[in-house]
Amino acid sequence: MDTFAALKSLSLAYGPPGREKEVRGLFKGYVNGLVDEVFEDTSGNLIVKRYGQHKGTVFFSAHMDEVCFLVSKVLPEGFLRLEGIGADVKLLPSQKVWIHTRSGKRLRGVIGMLAPHLQTEETRKKLNGFEDLFVDVSMSDFSEISVGDFVTYDNEPFSTGDFFFGKSLDDRACGVIIVKMLERLTALRHDFDVFAAFSSREEIGAFGARTAAYALQPDIGIALDVTHAIDTSPNYPKNEFGKGPVIAVGAIPHRKISNLLIETAKQNGIPYQIEPSPSRTGTDTDQIQLETVAAGVVSLPLRYMHTPYEQICVKDIDETARLLALFVSALKEGVV
Amino acid sequence: MFLKDLCEINGASGNEDRVRSYIQEQLKSPEEPGQVDVLGNLFFEKKGNGTSDKTILLMAHTDEVGLMVTNIQDDGLLAVSPIGGVDPRVLLGKRVWVGENNLPGVIGYKAIHLQKEDFKTLPDWDKVRVDIGAQKKEEAQKSVNLGDYVHFYSPFEEYENRYVGKALDDRAGCALLMALYRELPVLNHRVVFAFVVQEEIGLRGSGSTLKRYKPDAAIVVEGTTAGDNPELKRERWSTHLDNGPAISYLQSGYALDYRLFEAIVAFANQKGILYQLKGRTVGGTDGTRLASTYFGVPCAGVNIPSRYIHSPVSVISKKDFENTKQFIADILTEEILLKALEVKV
């Protein structure tokens, strides 16, 4: 798989929570030939299975959905009001968006901003909320737009050097890690059967991963998600780009799993970083663990999360896939 | 298409070379190669048929608002300052072009999850940073220099009724002048088409036009503020899209020549042309400079209403563009300005 090409297609794909069909289609294509079974469950997860020697089961999940907005009102003259899930309103002025109508059309819109000439002292100081922002859709026939239509960022992903910028890399870039891990597993012996879910609806509560874990009942379950890169908070380590996967240690990640991941990294000279996770991890793992599964979290450093241009380092994708493939191949019966 | 090409060329104030070259390439002929002055203004002259010694000047500015790299931080991020009027609120999460080689970059912003009190604070210039993927100052310095220009990344789009893109202020005016230069027949008087630099940082380019051509009257064509946003009451709008050319009567620093203004309005009424008067007096144009330089040239403003100018995405009406172009062509052909000036002040 061409990582850059896949990241670009995935970043551009439409897939708010519960509307992940386009993303599912892409992943279905990428796993072709790498797995023994592919199916879609009723929650909208894409589940794949690659069999080993049936000595145990290990499960990975990476979510397909993205942060998004919803049309809350259609005003005359082609203006819309919005509500949002998970995005920072401060970043919306002058942002281009796609409006996805229920009839299946994709229309363009522009979140307008009053020109500086017309600002007053008061409006210059105002922090815009959803009550102020509007989408100009006067450039399209907006008669089919209705309340409840989904709205997503319209922008163009790009790469520069080892870095890739675009929307929805949270968490589709981790889906790419799963595919690249499966590619590597074709050349490795593994006792454990490998299950993976490209999961749905994480951004509103990780429903997809929960139902997938319930259905598959794996021994080990590892969520692959993104974590904040270059967070300047003095209370946490700074996750850096190009320094490898971030392994979570803490309450929810099972100690044996975290340790085994760290051991595997050390033995194979894979750089890694540690993320302390005192309580909930905010990833699919919080749900996977509840199915009585030895859980883990491996994260990809990402900067500017939930914004139109999230940033990742492509080297980190490769290193994480390598770590996970070697981890899987090291799993022996009765490990947990 | 002139407008698409013009909007996609980067040219903030002081960096208009590429815009100027494009216009000159498109318009030049063996008879009129175009003239460039020392400031970077470009002029095309359409000679009259000899029956009149008068000159009418049409003017649009080639520059756009943008940013400049003012510091390269130790962490590889670039600090920027505005060139012209830019509201930092329109920059967050946007893609930009950095420097002469159009290096891609992003104005990133701290993830919502990591914000605390700053969630409720207004983003200012101290928070606007361009990320080009460099992790250290030395790395960034390999491809970026202090003083490099930063331009909005914004592919132009054409719709049935709208054009969407950056820099419609004032590439819409430039495209309109280019079309008129191509389409206008030879008139009795001379027409000078001026594409001038550095409007956005204080109307700095336009004055030199007067020394060179001594025009009798001028029309400045701007992509002018619309402000017909839902948050503004109708009476506070500046102009409204689809309502036709916007004629200005008073703007920052200049009450447009009343003889020209009245004549243009009377002409529009007589011909039954859909037009609007610009409802707000904010914003200056090169008309202010023309009227206050040397002998002071009587000046009119006929503009294309534009939404969200000075941001990465502005919007104009296709109909307004065409109607404004036709209206100005008719004003020139029927010598409305010259007739108006025969009346003594």
Predicted features along the sequence, with ranges:
Chain A
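N-terminal hydrophobic/helix-forming segments and targeting peptides
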Residues: 1-336
